[in-house]
Amino acid sequence: MNLKKTMMAAAIALGLAAPAAAAEKYKIGYDIYFGGNSWSVQLYKEFQAEAEKHKDAVEVSYTESELKADKQVANIEDLITKGVNAIIITPISPTAVIPVLKKAQAKGIKVVLLASKIKSKDYDALVTVNDEDFGKVGAEWLAKKLNGKGKIIALNGISGISASDDRWAGAQEVFKAYPDIQVVSAVDASWDYAQAKVAVSNLLAANPEIDGIWSQGGGMTLGAIDGFDAAQRKLVPMTGEDNNGYLKRWVALTDKGYTSVAPSKPTWLGSESLLVALKLLKGEAVEKDTIFPPPVIDDANVAKSVRADLSDSFWVNTRLSDDEVRAAFKD
């Protein structure tokens, strides 16, 4: 009798456990829009780390778009075919993805835009920082450092990508209030060290007077510094970003009078995008546009922000653990 009761109890326990074991996970599609710089890699790693924390609830399908808008459209089509419940993308083009995102929404798929906008409202949530404010922070700081006058170079990312366009729009709005600040040249350097160094070197050769650099990327600012060094020109005030390698250089140059400011677009947005997607899938209330103010590193707090023990490739505004950072970046 006792054996029979024990077997029945076990059967009941198994029966109770069965629905939990059989519970379906949310299917999330995540498009890695680009893997060509450390910021985009860390953005993806932040998402991946958050997904690992929720591995009992989510199953992720990854695609890679290699900064190609047509490939991103095809990847979203593929994710729709796979029957995902939500798609998280960083739009490469603000227009090219609109038709396929409409298609996804028509099938009941939640669409979360990560770190970049589109020119329509065909999405369920946007998670980003205010890129116009990012541009304004650096521009206002630079204008004041130059006492409202001087010749500057502007280093942009990639025209057509909303983050780059919005940052430059914000900066231009500020510079309009300072008529004695002359933008000698505004160049696209793709957030890339080498492209920025070449561009700055060429502009220094053609312009005996450059008083400042407005840059919307830490790697580009490093390229600008090295361009000045190669030309044997005295460093000028430059804006940067929260790239650890840039912060290390900044700290090393403070004794020489170098000064900077670094607004940030935190890579933890990748983590936040999954949390927002999960809320949407659970039917919880979510703001359509979650837009954070850009954190700012300046001369007063850079020494506390830099991580001398971690990779130059690392971006300091993160939710990753030190071990996760070391696993992501081996340099």
What are these regions (language model features)?
Residues M8-L16:
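Hydrophobic helical h-region of N-terminal Sec-dependent signal peptides
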Residues A22-D331:
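A residue-level marker of the well-folded mature domains of exported/periplasmic proteins
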Residues M1-M8:
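Bacterial N-terminal signal peptides that target proteins for export
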